[in-house]
């Protein structure tokens, strides 16, 4: 939802913005502005990692596994996947051209270089940034920006030694970015220490929502609010990792 809303906002401001799905099609309650084809299709990258002979399967068959409809069906329970079972795959993806998904790295980078030729590329997290070294080599003029958001929740569930190795690799990739965007100073500083990043290079961009749909909303019930009272709106999942309970307590 956030990625789709961000792409919409950039387009409204006149930016030539492409929202490119990785792993699975974009899932959103609103109209999607994402491109229809998927790179690093979730089924393909899993089979490339777990079944060595799969790399010899003809490309046209692999593309069938990247069809949005099939991916949406095959990954409908992806949110319940235990990170503890994905240690090898995580490290392989972070290894980029040295990983088991090297052919997917080559395919994505060639598409960016030959067809898109972007001025800037925004990674919505560093867990998908294994392609950065290849992009740096093939598109040296492109600015690379990554958002740190939620990476810690996934890393926390990786068992040792996968967690430490993944953190080290993510730190290396982050240091190759032109900028790292964070939604809060505290989170940014915490992740900078964890990943070995320079906190001075972090750019703060607080989370927001599009209020346009609510501007004409009239509540059914009006409540008296004492002068000077502060009201806080919370628009997110109610989950421990969001920290709402800390605010309430």
What name fits each language-model region?
Residues 19-110:
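A conserved catalytic-core segment of Leloir-type glycosyltransferases
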Residues 109-113, 117, 162-180:
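Membrane-proximal helix-turn-helix segments that form the acceptor-binding/catalytic region
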Residues 124-128:
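Short His-centered aromatic/hydrophobic patch
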Residues 186, 208:
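Carbohydrate-associated surface elements
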């Amino acid at each position: 939802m956030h990625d789709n809303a961000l792409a919409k906002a950039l387009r409204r401001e006149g930016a030539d913005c492409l929202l490119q799905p990785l792993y699975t099609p974009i899932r959103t309650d609103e109209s999607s502005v994402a491109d229809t084809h998927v790179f690093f299709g979730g089924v393909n990258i899993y089979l490339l990692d777990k079944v060595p002979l799969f790399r010899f399967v003809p490309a046209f068959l692999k593309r069938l596994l990247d069809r949005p409809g099939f991916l949406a069906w095959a990954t409908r329970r992806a949110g319940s996947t235990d990170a503890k079972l994905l240690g090898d795959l995580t490290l392989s993806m972070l290894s980029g051209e040295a990983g088991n998904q090297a052919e997917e790295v080559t395919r994505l980078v060639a598409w960016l270089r030959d067809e898109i030729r972007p001025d800037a590329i925004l990674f919505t997290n560093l867990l998908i940034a294994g392609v950065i070294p290849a992009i740096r080599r093939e598109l040296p003029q492109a600015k690379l920006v990554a958002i740190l958001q939620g990476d810690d929740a996934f890393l926390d569930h990786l068992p040792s030694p996968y967690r430490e190795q993944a953190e080290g690799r993510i730190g290396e990739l982050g240091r190759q970015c032109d900028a790292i965007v964070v939604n809060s100073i505290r989170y940014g500083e915490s992740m900078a220490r964890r990943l070995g990043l320079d906190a001075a290079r972090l750019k703060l961009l607080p989370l927001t929502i599009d209020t346009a749909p609510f501007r004409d909303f009239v509540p059914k019930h009006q409540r008296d609010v004492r002068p000077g009272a502060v009201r806080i709106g919370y628009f997110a999942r109610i989950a421990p990792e969001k920290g709402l309970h800390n605010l309430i307590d």
